Amino acid sequence: MGFNLNNCYSHPGKLLKVHLENVALLSKRITSSDAAELVSLFHDIGKVNPNFQQKLNGSCPKGYDHHAYLSAYAFLMFLIKNPDIFKALVPQGFNSNNFLISLITIVAKHHGDLPDMIPNDGNPILSGYEVSNLYAFLDKEHISFGNVISELLGIEPSMPSSIEEDRIIRLFLKRIVNKPNDYNVALRFYLEIQSIFSALVKADKSDAGDVLSMLDENEQNLNSFSHIYPDILQGYLDNLNSQTLLNVERTKIRLESINSIRKGLEEGKQIFELTAPTGSGKTLMLLSLASEIIKSKGAKRIIYGLPFLSITEQVESEVLKILKGYEYFVQRIDSKSTNTRFDDIQKELDENPSEKLLQELEALEFQEETFGYPFIITTFVRIFETLLGNKNHELMKLPNFSNCVFLLDEIQSLPPRLYGFFIAYLDKFCKLTGSFAIVSTATQPALRLPDDNKEAKEFFLDYEPPFKLLSLSHYENPVFNRYTVEVQKSIIDIEQLGHQVLQEEKIGACYLEYDSRYKRLIQFHHRKYG
Protein backbone atom coordinates (compact mmCIF):
# COMPACT_ATOMS: atom_id res chain seq x y z
CA MET A 1 0.00 0.00 0.00
CA GLY A 2 1.53 3.30 -1.16
CA PHE A 3 0.54 6.81 -0.09
CA ASN A 4 0.18 10.29 -1.50
CA LEU A 5 1.52 12.80 1.02
CA ASN A 6 -0.72 15.48 -0.42
CA ASN A 7 -3.74 13.54 0.82
CA CYS A 8 -2.45 12.97 4.36
CA TYR A 9 -2.62 15.32 7.33
CA SER A 10 -0.48 15.67 10.46
CA HIS A 11 -2.97 17.80 12.40
CA PRO A 12 -6.45 19.10 11.59
CA GLY A 13 -6.12 21.32 8.54
CA LYS A 14 -2.34 20.83 8.14
CA LEU A 15 -0.87 18.66 5.39
CA LEU A 16 1.61 16.05 6.61
CA LYS A 17 4.23 17.01 4.03
CA VAL A 18 4.05 20.67 5.08
CA HIS A 19 4.41 19.73 8.75
CA LEU A 20 7.40 17.44 8.16
CA GLU A 21 9.20 20.02 6.04
CA ASN A 22 8.47 22.82 8.52
CA VAL A 23 9.76 20.81 11.48
CA ALA A 24 12.89 19.81 9.56
CA LEU A 25 13.67 23.44 8.70
CA LEU A 26 13.05 24.53 12.30
CA SER A 27 15.24 21.76 13.74
CA LYS A 28 18.11 22.73 11.45
CA ARG A 29 17.62 26.37 12.46
CA ILE A 30 17.65 25.47 16.16
CA THR A 31 20.73 23.22 16.15
CA SER A 32 22.39 23.42 12.70
CA SER A 33 22.46 19.59 12.98
CA ASP A 34 21.99 17.55 9.79
CA ALA A 35 20.93 14.58 11.92
CA ALA A 36 18.20 16.65 13.62
CA GLU A 37 16.92 17.74 10.22
CA LEU A 38 16.73 14.14 8.94
CA VAL A 39 15.10 12.83 12.11
CA SER A 40 12.51 15.60 11.83
CA LEU A 41 11.64 14.61 8.26
CA PHE A 42 10.85 11.09 9.50
CA HIS A 43 9.36 11.81 12.94
CA ASP A 44 5.69 11.81 11.85
CA ILE A 45 5.93 9.86 8.61
CA GLY A 46 3.91 7.10 10.28
CA LYS A 47 0.87 9.39 10.20
CA VAL A 48 0.22 8.02 6.71
CA ASN A 49 -1.36 5.18 8.69
CA PRO A 50 -4.95 5.03 7.34
CA ASN A 51 -6.28 4.42 10.84
CA PHE A 52 -4.53 7.55 12.13
CA GLN A 53 -6.02 9.58 9.27
CA GLN A 54 -9.49 8.30 10.20
CA LYS A 55 -8.92 9.26 13.84
CA LEU A 56 -7.81 12.72 12.75
CA ASN A 57 -11.10 13.12 10.88
CA GLY A 58 -13.08 12.32 14.00
CA SER A 59 -13.78 8.66 13.24
CA CYS A 60 -13.12 5.78 15.63
CA PRO A 61 -10.93 3.28 13.75
CA LYS A 62 -10.86 -0.28 15.06
CA GLY A 63 -7.29 -1.02 14.05
CA TYR A 64 -3.81 0.17 15.07
CA ASP A 65 -3.88 3.98 14.88
CA HIS A 66 -0.50 4.94 16.37
CA HIS A 67 2.23 6.63 14.36
CA ALA A 68 5.51 7.10 16.30
CA TYR A 69 6.71 3.47 16.17
CA LEU A 70 5.56 3.20 12.56
CA SER A 71 7.70 6.27 11.81
CA ALA A 72 10.68 4.64 13.57
CA TYR A 73 10.15 1.46 11.53
CA ALA A 74 10.18 3.45 8.26
CA PHE A 75 13.32 5.29 9.40
CA LEU A 76 15.04 2.01 10.29
CA MET A 77 14.27 0.57 6.84
CA PHE A 78 15.74 3.66 5.23
CA LEU A 79 18.93 3.57 7.36
CA ILE A 80 19.61 -0.13 6.80
CA LYS A 81 19.01 -0.06 3.05
CA ASN A 82 20.58 3.35 2.29
CA PRO A 83 23.81 3.79 4.33
CA ASP A 84 25.50 5.86 1.61
CA ILE A 85 22.57 8.27 1.35
CA PHE A 86 22.58 8.64 5.14
CA LYS A 87 26.30 9.46 5.17
CA ALA A 88 25.77 12.05 2.45
CA LEU A 89 22.88 13.64 4.35
CA VAL A 90 24.59 13.48 7.77
CA PRO A 91 28.33 13.78 7.05
CA GLN A 92 29.25 14.98 10.57
CA GLY A 93 27.36 12.33 12.56
CA PHE A 94 28.92 9.68 14.79
CA ASN A 95 29.98 6.67 12.72
CA SER A 96 28.48 4.04 15.02
CA ASN A 97 25.50 1.75 15.46
CA ASN A 98 24.79 3.52 18.76
CA PHE A 99 24.19 6.76 16.86
CA LEU A 100 21.76 5.15 14.41
CA ILE A 101 19.94 3.32 17.21
CA SER A 102 19.62 6.55 19.19
CA LEU A 103 18.17 8.40 16.18
CA ILE A 104 15.59 5.65 15.66
CA THR A 105 14.75 5.80 19.37
CA ILE A 106 14.25 9.57 19.19
CA VAL A 107 11.68 9.10 16.42
CA ALA A 108 9.85 6.36 18.34
CA LYS A 109 9.85 8.29 21.65
CA HIS A 110 9.41 11.90 20.55
CA HIS A 111 6.02 12.19 22.30
CA GLY A 112 7.51 10.96 25.57
CA ASP A 113 10.79 11.30 27.44
CA LEU A 114 14.26 10.48 26.16
CA PRO A 115 14.73 6.92 27.47
CA ASP A 116 17.69 5.16 29.01
CA MET A 117 19.67 3.97 25.99
CA ILE A 118 21.22 1.10 27.97
CA PRO A 119 18.43 -0.15 30.27
CA ASN A 120 19.71 -1.61 33.55
CA ASP A 121 17.28 -4.53 33.34
CA GLY A 122 18.79 -5.73 30.05
CA ASN A 123 15.54 -5.22 28.13
CA PRO A 124 15.41 -3.47 24.74
CA ILE A 125 14.91 0.30 24.65
CA LEU A 126 11.58 0.20 22.85
CA SER A 127 8.31 -1.22 24.18
CA GLY A 128 7.86 -4.87 23.20
CA TYR A 129 4.10 -4.48 23.46
CA GLU A 130 4.08 -1.50 21.08
CA VAL A 131 6.38 -3.27 18.61
CA SER A 132 4.19 -6.39 18.60
CA ASN A 133 1.07 -4.32 17.89
CA LEU A 134 2.93 -2.54 15.08
CA TYR A 135 3.96 -5.82 13.45
CA ALA A 136 0.44 -7.23 13.68
CA PHE A 137 -0.75 -4.11 11.86
CA LEU A 138 1.98 -4.37 9.19
CA ASP A 139 1.08 -8.01 8.52
CA LYS A 140 -2.43 -6.90 7.58
CA GLU A 141 -1.73 -3.63 5.77
CA HIS A 142 1.59 -4.27 3.92
CA ILE A 143 2.48 -0.56 3.98
CA SER A 144 5.13 0.74 1.56
CA PHE A 145 7.10 3.90 2.37
CA GLY A 146 9.25 4.11 -0.78
CA ASN A 147 7.26 6.79 -2.59
CA VAL A 148 6.75 8.82 0.63
CA ILE A 149 10.49 8.90 1.42
CA SER A 150 11.26 9.69 -2.22
CA GLU A 151 8.92 12.67 -2.15
CA LEU A 152 10.42 14.00 1.09
CA LEU A 153 14.10 13.55 0.21
CA GLY A 154 13.94 14.08 -3.55
CA ILE A 155 15.88 10.86 -4.17
CA GLU A 156 14.86 7.27 -4.88
CA PRO A 157 15.70 5.15 -1.81
CA SER A 158 16.28 1.40 -1.71
CA MET A 159 13.68 -0.49 0.29
CA PRO A 160 13.41 -4.13 1.50
CA SER A 161 12.74 -6.37 -1.48
CA SER A 162 12.11 -9.70 0.23
CA ILE A 163 10.30 -11.20 3.18
CA GLU A 164 13.67 -12.22 4.65
CA GLU A 165 14.98 -8.64 4.56
CA ASP A 166 11.85 -7.38 6.25
CA ARG A 167 12.11 -10.12 8.89
CA ILE A 168 15.69 -9.05 9.76
CA ILE A 169 14.65 -5.40 10.05
CA ARG A 170 11.75 -6.29 12.32
CA LEU A 171 13.97 -8.43 14.53
CA PHE A 172 16.46 -5.55 14.84
CA LEU A 173 13.75 -3.07 15.90
CA LYS A 174 12.36 -5.50 18.47
CA ARG A 175 15.76 -6.04 20.12
CA ILE A 176 17.15 -2.54 19.73
CA VAL A 177 19.69 -1.64 22.43
CA ASN A 178 22.86 0.45 22.70
CA LYS A 179 26.28 -0.66 23.84
CA PRO A 180 28.43 1.47 26.18
CA ASN A 181 30.37 4.21 24.40
CA ASP A 182 34.06 4.72 24.98
CA TYR A 183 34.67 7.22 27.79
CA ASN A 184 36.40 9.68 25.49
CA VAL A 185 33.24 10.15 23.37
CA ALA A 186 30.45 9.27 25.83
CA LEU A 187 29.70 12.81 27.03
CA ARG A 188 29.82 14.38 23.56
CA PHE A 189 27.58 11.58 22.29
CA TYR A 190 25.03 12.11 25.07
CA LEU A 191 24.94 15.88 24.55
CA GLU A 192 24.47 15.41 20.80
CA ILE A 193 21.55 12.99 21.23
CA GLN A 194 19.98 15.21 23.90
CA SER A 195 20.32 18.19 21.56
CA ILE A 196 18.71 16.40 18.59
CA PHE A 197 15.80 15.20 20.74
CA SER A 198 15.19 18.65 22.24
CA ALA A 199 15.38 20.33 18.82
CA LEU A 200 12.79 17.91 17.42
CA VAL A 201 10.45 18.34 20.39
CA LYS A 202 10.63 22.14 20.26
CA ALA A 203 10.30 22.32 16.47
CA ASP A 204 7.40 19.85 16.44
CA LYS A 205 5.44 21.75 19.08
CA SER A 206 6.28 25.10 17.47
CA ASP A 207 4.79 24.07 14.13
CA ALA A 208 1.86 22.14 15.59
CA GLY A 209 0.99 25.06 17.87
CA ASP A 210 1.43 27.70 15.16
CA VAL A 211 3.88 29.75 17.23
CA LEU A 212 6.47 30.20 14.48
CA SER A 213 5.99 33.97 14.53
CA MET A 214 6.86 33.97 18.25
CA LEU A 215 10.20 32.29 17.50
CA ASP A 216 11.03 35.09 15.07
CA GLU A 217 9.90 37.68 17.62
CA ASN A 218 12.02 36.05 20.34
CA GLU A 219 15.06 36.21 18.10
CA GLN A 220 14.43 39.89 17.32
CA ASN A 221 13.99 40.65 21.04
CA LEU A 222 17.24 38.88 21.85
CA ASN A 223 19.13 40.96 19.30
CA SER A 224 17.49 44.18 20.50
CA PHE A 225 18.24 43.36 24.14
CA SER A 226 21.87 42.52 23.42
CA HIS A 227 22.25 45.78 21.53
CA ILE A 228 20.97 48.02 24.34
CA TYR A 229 22.01 46.06 27.43
CA PRO A 230 25.69 47.14 27.73
CA ASP A 231 24.86 50.86 27.46
CA ILE A 232 21.90 50.69 29.86
CA LEU A 233 23.97 48.83 32.45
CA GLN A 234 26.86 51.26 32.11
CA GLY A 235 24.50 54.22 32.53
CA TYR A 236 23.13 52.68 35.73
CA LEU A 237 26.63 52.09 37.09
CA ASP A 238 27.72 55.64 36.27
CA ASN A 239 24.85 57.02 38.35
CA LEU A 240 25.70 55.03 41.48
CA ASN A 241 27.23 56.80 44.46
CA SER A 242 30.77 55.48 44.48
CA GLN A 243 32.23 57.88 47.06
CA THR A 244 32.03 55.60 50.10
CA LEU A 245 35.04 53.45 50.93
CA LEU A 246 33.03 50.29 50.32
CA ASN A 247 31.73 51.41 46.92
CA VAL A 248 35.18 52.57 45.81
CA GLU A 249 36.50 49.09 46.58
CA ARG A 250 33.54 47.44 44.83
CA THR A 251 34.23 49.49 41.69
CA LYS A 252 37.91 48.56 41.83
CA ILE A 253 37.09 44.84 42.06
CA ARG A 254 34.50 45.05 39.29
CA LEU A 255 36.95 46.73 36.92
CA GLU A 256 39.59 44.11 37.75
CA SER A 257 37.14 41.30 36.92
CA ILE A 258 36.21 43.01 33.63
CA ASN A 259 39.87 43.30 32.60
CA SER A 260 40.38 39.65 33.50
CA ILE A 261 37.43 38.37 31.48
CA ARG A 262 38.58 40.36 28.45
CA LYS A 263 41.89 38.52 28.67
CA GLY A 264 40.14 35.18 29.14
CA LEU A 265 37.88 35.75 26.13
CA GLU A 266 40.91 36.59 24.00
CA GLU A 267 42.41 33.25 25.07
CA GLY A 268 39.25 31.41 24.01
CA LYS A 269 37.99 30.62 27.53
CA GLN A 270 34.26 30.00 27.99
CA ILE A 271 33.87 29.27 31.69
CA PHE A 272 35.03 31.61 34.44
CA GLU A 273 35.26 31.65 38.24
CA LEU A 274 34.31 34.77 40.18
CA THR A 275 35.39 34.35 43.80
CA ALA A 276 34.83 37.56 45.74
CA PRO A 277 34.12 38.53 49.37
CA THR A 278 30.58 38.86 50.65
CA GLY A 279 29.49 42.46 50.17
CA SER A 280 31.74 43.12 47.16
CA GLY A 281 28.79 43.57 44.80
CA LYS A 282 28.83 40.24 42.96
CA THR A 283 25.41 40.83 41.36
CA LEU A 284 26.57 43.96 39.52
CA MET A 285 29.88 42.28 38.78
CA LEU A 286 28.13 39.32 37.16
CA LEU A 287 25.88 41.60 35.12
CA SER A 288 28.93 43.60 33.98
CA LEU A 289 30.79 40.44 32.99
CA ALA A 290 27.80 39.26 30.95
CA SER A 291 27.87 42.64 29.22
CA GLU A 292 31.52 42.14 28.30
CA ILE A 293 30.78 38.73 26.80
CA ILE A 294 27.92 40.17 24.72
CA LYS A 295 30.11 43.05 23.51
CA SER A 296 32.87 40.62 22.54
CA LYS A 297 30.90 37.63 21.22
CA GLY A 298 27.60 39.07 19.97
CA ALA A 299 23.97 38.60 21.01
CA LYS A 300 23.52 36.23 23.94
CA ARG A 301 20.63 35.27 26.20
CA ILE A 302 21.43 35.72 29.90
CA ILE A 303 20.34 32.96 32.30
CA TYR A 304 20.92 34.01 35.90
CA GLY A 305 20.77 30.95 38.16
CA LEU A 306 20.49 30.98 41.96
CA PRO A 307 19.99 28.27 44.58
CA PHE A 308 17.11 29.78 46.57
CA LEU A 309 13.78 31.42 45.76
CA SER A 310 14.39 34.33 48.13
CA ILE A 311 17.53 35.29 46.21
CA THR A 312 15.84 35.06 42.81
CA GLU A 313 13.36 37.69 44.02
CA GLN A 314 16.21 39.98 45.15
CA VAL A 315 18.06 39.66 41.85
CA GLU A 316 14.85 40.21 39.88
CA SER A 317 14.27 43.46 41.79
CA GLU A 318 17.81 44.65 41.03
CA VAL A 319 17.66 43.71 37.34
CA LEU A 320 14.27 45.37 36.81
CA LYS A 321 15.63 48.52 38.43
CA ILE A 322 18.52 48.55 35.95
CA LEU A 323 16.34 47.74 32.92
CA LYS A 324 13.58 50.20 33.78
CA GLY A 325 11.45 50.70 30.69
CA TYR A 326 12.62 47.40 29.21
CA GLU A 327 11.08 45.06 31.76
CA TYR A 328 9.49 42.96 28.99
CA PHE A 329 12.95 41.56 28.22
CA VAL A 330 13.17 40.02 31.70
CA GLN A 331 11.29 37.08 33.18
CA ARG A 332 11.79 35.31 36.49
CA ILE A 333 10.76 31.67 36.19
CA ASP A 334 10.45 29.59 39.34
CA SER A 335 7.74 28.00 41.47
CA LYS A 336 6.64 31.38 42.90
CA SER A 337 7.05 33.67 39.89
CA THR A 338 4.19 35.32 38.01
CA ASN A 339 3.78 36.76 34.53
CA THR A 340 1.70 39.94 34.61
CA ARG A 341 0.74 39.69 30.94
CA PHE A 342 -0.45 36.13 31.52
CA ASP A 343 -2.67 37.32 34.38
CA ASP A 344 -4.04 40.19 32.26
CA ILE A 345 -4.99 37.83 29.44
CA GLN A 346 -6.76 35.52 31.88
CA LYS A 347 -8.89 38.45 33.09
CA GLU A 348 -9.64 39.55 29.52
CA LEU A 349 -10.67 36.02 28.62
CA ASP A 350 -13.09 35.90 31.54
CA GLU A 351 -14.72 39.13 30.35
CA ASN A 352 -14.52 38.67 26.58
CA PRO A 353 -13.31 35.27 25.29
CA SER A 354 -11.65 35.34 21.87
CA GLU A 355 -9.52 33.08 19.68
CA LYS A 356 -6.84 35.77 19.44
CA LEU A 357 -6.45 35.95 23.24
CA LEU A 358 -6.31 32.16 23.49
CA GLN A 359 -3.53 32.08 20.90
CA GLU A 360 -1.60 34.76 22.78
CA LEU A 361 -2.02 32.82 26.02
CA GLU A 362 -0.69 29.64 24.40
CA ALA A 363 2.23 31.58 22.93
CA LEU A 364 3.12 33.03 26.36
CA GLU A 365 3.01 29.56 27.91
CA PHE A 366 5.29 28.28 25.15
CA GLN A 367 7.69 31.18 25.65
CA GLU A 368 7.99 30.40 29.35
CA GLU A 369 8.31 26.65 28.76
CA THR A 370 11.19 27.25 26.36
CA PHE A 371 12.98 30.09 28.22
CA GLY A 372 12.31 32.34 25.25
CA TYR A 373 13.03 35.66 27.03
CA PRO A 374 16.36 37.50 26.56
CA PHE A 375 17.01 37.64 30.34
CA ILE A 376 15.91 34.72 32.53
CA ILE A 377 16.22 34.61 36.33
CA THR A 378 15.66 31.13 37.69
CA THR A 379 16.77 28.49 40.17
CA PHE A 380 19.54 25.93 39.95
CA VAL A 381 16.87 23.23 39.96
CA ARG A 382 15.32 24.51 36.71
CA ILE A 383 18.73 24.72 35.06
CA PHE A 384 19.92 21.29 36.22
CA GLU A 385 16.65 19.59 35.25
CA THR A 386 17.22 20.79 31.70
CA LEU A 387 20.99 20.39 31.39
CA LEU A 388 21.07 16.93 32.93
CA GLY A 389 17.51 15.79 32.27
CA ASN A 390 15.57 13.58 29.89
CA LYS A 391 12.02 14.87 30.42
CA ASN A 392 10.21 16.02 27.29
CA HIS A 393 8.84 19.23 28.80
CA GLU A 394 12.15 20.14 30.48
CA LEU A 395 14.19 19.61 27.31
CA MET A 396 11.98 22.15 25.53
CA LYS A 397 14.28 24.74 27.17
CA LEU A 398 17.55 23.16 26.06
CA PRO A 399 17.81 24.80 22.61
CA ASN A 400 17.76 28.21 24.32
CA PHE A 401 20.66 27.13 26.55
CA SER A 402 22.85 27.38 23.44
CA ASN A 403 24.51 30.70 22.63
CA CYS A 404 23.82 32.14 26.08
CA VAL A 405 25.60 33.41 29.18
CA PHE A 406 25.04 31.48 32.42
CA LEU A 407 25.49 33.52 35.59
CA LEU A 408 25.52 30.96 38.41
CA ASP A 409 25.76 32.63 41.81
CA GLU A 410 26.34 30.93 45.18
CA ILE A 411 27.70 27.82 43.45
CA GLN A 412 28.98 26.55 46.82
CA SER A 413 25.37 25.65 47.70
CA LEU A 414 25.77 22.51 45.59
CA PRO A 415 26.77 19.32 47.42
CA PRO A 416 30.60 19.38 47.56
CA ARG A 417 30.87 16.06 45.69
CA LEU A 418 29.24 17.76 42.67
CA TYR A 419 31.47 20.85 42.44
CA GLY A 420 33.96 19.39 39.99
CA PHE A 421 31.46 17.21 38.14
CA PHE A 422 28.96 19.96 37.40
CA ILE A 423 31.54 22.56 36.37
CA ALA A 424 33.27 20.04 34.09
CA TYR A 425 29.91 19.12 32.57
CA LEU A 426 29.01 22.78 32.09
CA ASP A 427 32.41 23.41 30.51
CA LYS A 428 31.81 20.68 27.91
CA PHE A 429 28.28 21.91 27.24
CA CYS A 430 29.47 25.48 26.66
CA LYS A 431 32.20 24.35 24.27
CA LEU A 432 29.69 22.43 22.15
CA THR A 433 26.95 25.09 22.14
CA GLY A 434 28.74 28.43 21.93
CA SER A 435 27.71 29.39 25.46
CA PHE A 436 29.64 30.97 28.32
CA ALA A 437 29.38 30.57 32.09
CA ILE A 438 30.50 32.50 35.15
CA VAL A 439 30.29 30.64 38.46
CA SER A 440 30.34 32.90 41.49
CA THR A 441 31.01 32.28 45.15
CA ALA A 442 32.37 33.87 48.30
CA THR A 443 33.65 30.66 49.89
CA GLN A 444 36.20 29.34 47.38
CA PRO A 445 34.97 25.77 46.77
CA ALA A 446 37.37 23.46 44.92
CA LEU A 447 36.12 23.34 41.32
CA ARG A 448 38.38 20.49 40.23
CA LEU A 449 37.87 16.81 39.64
CA PRO A 450 38.92 14.42 42.44
CA ASP A 451 42.56 13.42 42.03
CA ASP A 452 41.81 9.79 42.86
CA ASN A 453 38.89 9.39 40.42
CA LYS A 454 40.41 8.01 37.22
CA GLU A 455 37.03 7.45 35.54
CA ALA A 456 35.97 11.08 36.05
CA LYS A 457 39.21 12.32 34.51
CA GLU A 458 38.75 10.03 31.49
CA PHE A 459 35.11 11.08 31.13
CA PHE A 460 36.01 14.80 31.25
CA LEU A 461 39.23 14.29 29.35
CA ASP A 462 39.96 17.88 28.32
CA TYR A 463 38.59 19.61 31.43
CA GLU A 464 40.50 22.50 32.96
CA PRO A 465 39.28 24.42 36.03
CA PRO A 466 37.54 27.74 35.25
CA PHE A 467 39.54 30.84 34.38
CA LYS A 468 39.94 32.87 37.60
CA LEU A 469 38.80 36.48 37.37
CA LEU A 470 39.99 37.88 40.72
CA SER A 471 42.90 37.68 43.09
CA LEU A 472 42.09 36.34 46.56
CA SER A 473 43.90 39.31 48.10
CA HIS A 474 40.58 41.20 48.30
CA TYR A 475 39.61 39.01 51.26
CA GLU A 476 42.33 40.75 53.28
CA ASN A 477 40.72 44.17 52.83
CA PRO A 478 39.23 45.25 56.20
CA VAL A 479 36.31 46.98 54.43
CA PHE A 480 34.79 43.52 53.88
CA ASN A 481 35.25 42.46 57.50
CA ARG A 482 31.69 43.37 58.41
CA TYR A 483 31.12 40.94 61.26
CA THR A 484 32.36 40.62 64.82
CA VAL A 485 31.86 37.49 66.86
CA GLU A 486 31.37 37.89 70.60
CA VAL A 487 31.65 34.65 72.52
CA GLN A 488 29.66 34.56 75.77
CA LYS A 489 31.91 32.65 78.15
CA SER A 490 29.95 33.09 81.36
CA ILE A 491 27.12 30.69 82.08
CA ILE A 492 23.68 32.29 81.72
CA ASP A 493 20.20 30.87 81.45
CA ILE A 494 17.83 31.24 78.49
CA GLU A 495 15.86 34.17 79.95
CA GLN A 496 19.07 36.12 80.62
CA LEU A 497 20.20 35.45 77.05
CA GLY A 498 16.79 36.54 75.75
CA HIS A 499 16.96 39.86 77.63
CA GLN A 500 20.53 40.41 76.43
CA VAL A 501 19.60 39.83 72.78
CA LEU A 502 16.59 42.15 73.00
CA GLN A 503 18.68 44.96 74.48
CA GLU A 504 21.07 44.97 71.50
CA GLU A 505 20.34 47.75 68.99
CA LYS A 506 22.10 45.91 66.17
CA ILE A 507 22.58 42.21 66.06
CA GLY A 508 23.20 40.02 63.05
CA ALA A 509 22.76 36.56 64.49
CA CYS A 510 22.64 34.60 67.69
CA TYR A 511 23.89 31.04 67.25
CA LEU A 512 22.57 28.19 69.35
CA GLU A 513 22.49 24.48 68.76
CA TYR A 514 19.08 23.45 67.49
CA ASP A 515 17.92 21.68 70.63
CA SER A 516 15.65 22.37 73.61
CA ARG A 517 17.56 25.59 74.44
CA TYR A 518 16.76 27.06 71.03
CA LYS A 519 13.08 26.17 71.48
CA ARG A 520 13.02 27.76 74.93
CA LEU A 521 14.51 30.99 73.53
CA ILE A 522 11.76 31.12 70.90
CA GLN A 523 9.14 30.53 73.60
CA PHE A 524 10.64 33.39 75.65
CA HIS A 525 10.38 35.71 72.62
CA HIS A 526 6.72 34.75 72.11
CA ARG A 527 5.92 35.44 75.76
CA LYS A 528 7.60 38.82 75.52
CA TYR A 529 6.02 39.95 72.25
CA GLY A 530 3.05 37.62 71.77
Across the structure, where does each feature detected by a protein language model lie?
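Conserved Walker A/P-loop ATP-binding site and its immediately adjacent core
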Residues: A299-L323, Q331-T338, A446-R448, Y518-K519
